[in-house]
Structure formats: structure tokens, C-alpha cells
Amino acid sequence: MSASVSRFASDDSPSMSWIVFPAAVCVLCAALLAALDLNEAWFIAWNTAASGIAPGFVWAGITNLASTLGAFALITPALAWRPRWLAATLLAAPVATLYTHGLKQFFAEPRPAAVLAQDQFNVVGLPLRTDSFPSGHSLTAFVIAGVVVLCASPAVRRQWAWVVLAAAVLMCFSRVAVGAHWPLDLFAGAAGGWLSAVIGVRWSAHWRFWERRRGVQTMGALMILVAVLLAFEDLGYPEGLWMQYLLVVWGMAGAVFALVRPVTCKVPA
């Protein structure tokens, strides 16, 4: 295995602080928000501020990055160099799905469009009214961020972790910007996403199919299918179609490149 791959593939286990701290911060923020009854006030303030920061099509594009298929397309080019990233994301997906859909069904919380008057906030895309808690997009953003940060070597983690986390926070914030979620939903989704990433990374250290040529080829073929499905999926944000199509091209190109140029490590024939 080459040095560049082994540096990320080796079990450079992150410290317990990296495993626990991001999720703990999100849980604490969610608890304070609920205890102080600031959910609605913060939503209106954040949503109003977002409309002054960037136009709707920008927020729609950012929010599409954190859709399920969009996020897989986003991370697909890593397959050629960092196959563990995609493997850990795939392994985290079942846990993340159970978390978000289980809580959505249990709580069945209304979204802002079902509670607030239409003139109180800005909506980008189709208005959503049901199954608000937790935010699936926020969960997805933090699954990707968690995988990238936790799979990285300590040196890379120290240098880039905060950049990756800032990008994930921006994707989460876009859910309030488009009027789809309460702030409480974002924190709950982010916490679940990070913990799902922890599990996915741990499982990827046990099931190392990503080190084999056949494993890389299988993931590449799966990501081609993801890109095709993304091309036809209605994400609910017509203003963000530009990002959706960019993700299709990005994911398809990344998958094809990984299949044409297998990851540079010693694998069985």
C-alpha cells in the first residue's frame, strides 16, 4: 500500500474528544434551545438574516449538497484516493437512516410552514409542513464531515477539521435559510450524523472491503447508479437545480475515474 493511502487507511484512531465533543456540543445547544424556548425566535432571526446574506438560489444549491444522493455524489471523487471515506459513509448510512426516520416518525413535529404565517419568514423551494425533527440534511452533512475528519491522520485532522466542520455547519444553516427546519432540528440532526459517522468509521476498520480492487469497483458502480438517480430525483428546490446537475457530473466523473484509475494500493487481482 502506498504511503499516501496507508496514512488515511491506517487505524490512526482519533482521540475521544474528537469522537464525542462535536456531538456533545450539538446536544447541549439543542437542550439549551428547548429549555429557553428560543426555537421560533432563532428560526425567524436566522431565516431573515440568511435572505440578506445570499439569494435563494444559493441557499437552495447549498442545501442540495446535503441531500442523501447529493452527499454521496459529493464524496464520490474521494474513491480514487481515499476509498475508506466512501466505505465509511456507506456503512454509516443504515444507522443514520434509522436515527432520522425513527425520530421523525416518533415525534412527527410540524415544520415552520405549518406553524408560522407565510409573511413571517422566507421559503425557498416547495414549502414543507411535516416531519421536522430531526433534520435529515443536517444529519447527512455531519455524516460526511465526521467521516472525513475521523478518517484523517492526526496531522491532517488538526489542519483541516475546522474547515470541514464549517462547511457542514453551512449546509445545516441552509435548512433554516430555505425555511424547511427549526434550529432545534439542525442540532439534533448534526449530533446523530456525527455519531453515525463514528460508527461507520469504526465498522470500516473492521470490514476493509475498500482495500480490495473488487470493493472499489463495486462502490464505483454503485456511485454511477447514485449519479443517474440524482439526475432524475426531485429534490424540491427548483432554484437549486444548478447544484444538482453539477453534483451529477461531479459524482459520475469521480466514479468513472475511480474505475479507470484504481486506488494506488496493493489489492488482490
Report residues per predicted region.
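N-terminal transmembrane-helix/juxtamembrane module of multi-pass inner/ER membrane proteins
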Residues: M1-G70, H101-T130, P262-A269
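Interfacial segments of alpha-helical transmembrane regions
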Residues: W18-I19, I75-Y99, A161-V164
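Alpha-helical transmembrane segments
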Residues: W18-L32, A92-A96, L165-A168, A221-V226
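Alpha-helical transmembrane spans of integral membrane proteins, capturing the lipid-embedded, hydrophobic core
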Residues: V25-C26, L69, T89, A93-T97, ...
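Membrane-interface alpha-helices at helix entry/exit sites of multi-pass transporters
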Residues: F57-A60, A87-A88, A155-W162
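Hydrophobic alpha-helical transmembrane segments
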Residues: T63-R82, H137-F142, G146-V147
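Alpha-helical transmembrane segments of multipass membrane proteins
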Residues: A96-T100, K104, M171, S196-A197
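Membrane-embedded catalytic cores of phosphoryl/pyrophosphoryl-handling enzymes
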Residues: N122-C265
